[in-house]
């Protein structure tokens, strides 16, 4: 009897051991994923909504599902659209305000209005200062064309859902990938609405024989020419005078604020070895998307998801299609490990300020000065005297983007510093 129990006991021990190991592995993976709640790796953070031989649509996972620290972004989503040359994204509407930024290629965007009205926009990434962008009001039917015969089109969209944090796209077309939303209406509703027999409605709108392979389809070059005429003749006025551009031989930053959406759009280009010096935004929560290249980023914030007087550095190695979130008031520095460019969206952009912590100009530390009855506030703030602090600051003759080729990065542990209320 005892002999029979021994194998069972061993099996039980082995089962518990494997269960414990599995739990430990799961816990470790969860802890690792929480090590940097601001970093979204392109390999596992994008969810594909549609894909065929002509392109794809994919959406980044919800920000607030990654970390409670990002719960203020629960009403914002990132969407990426890519399409091959001479293709059309079929007409649709979404339950979200959309802000489109063209990152490569060119596009013809058509907004459909009531009473047979349409607005045409020709958008391109060729603008040397800033890629074209366009706002699409929620519920507006629109379609997109890639008119270029050779170059792929890539668009990044900031979506602001109006119903709930999920985005719902409503396509009129019935394709192999999905049904037209009109098909969900009952037979008698459709017949009364179109004043036609259901058989005719089904043949004209929904019949499988005429269906496309998906929501991204090939388009005839003659149709593209006709659309291009409308788009170029109706092209909107340049907004370049509203741009705020700063740059030097190491990098360029261009920003533009859409006051109606309270959103900042930014474009950052950096040469390999360049450093965007430590800085922070006063109000805006910035969502950075890597378009091309690689970079090392360091963000300083409170340690852990709690009120604390300790802070730590959240570091990440960024590459193409990665996303990084920079909360308001969190200092950040970016070093280009190759030529790199980003698209940024800043939430809460109205009355936002960018504050630099190093460099010759716009440096808030050097602005502290002497304000307490003539006393040296800088000297009280740091271990050195105010003169020593200013001497240190003035050693850097560059601003915003500086050369970091010859400076090695040092690892630092978290220490007490920022006050969190």
From Swiss-Prot:
One Gene Ontology cellular component: vacuole
Pfam families linked to this entry: Cupin_1 (PF00190)
Gene3D superfamilies hit by this protein: Jelly Rolls
Domain of life: Eukaryota
Annotated glycan sites: 252, 341
Signal peptide per UniProt: 1-24
SUPFAM superfamilies per the UniProt record, alphabetical: RmlC-like cupins
Domain spans labelled Cupin type-1: 237-390
Compartments it resides in: Vacuole, Aleurone grain; Vacuole
UniProt GO molecular function: nutrient reservoir activity
SMART domains assigned to the protein according to its UniProt record, in alphabetical order: Cupin_1
Keyword annotations from UniProtKB, A to Z: Glycoprotein, Seed storage protein, Signal, Storage protein, Vacuole
Primary localization class, coarse: other
InterPro entries hit by this protein: Cupin_1 (IPR006045), RmlC-like_jellyroll (IPR014710), RmlC_Cupin_sf (IPR011051), Seed_Storage-Functional (IPR050253)
Record's subunit section: Homotrimer that associates to form a dodecamer.
Function per UniProt: Major seed storage protein.
UniProt similarity note: Belongs to the 7S seed storage protein family.
Name of protein: Phaseolin, beta-type
Organism: Phaseolus vulgaris
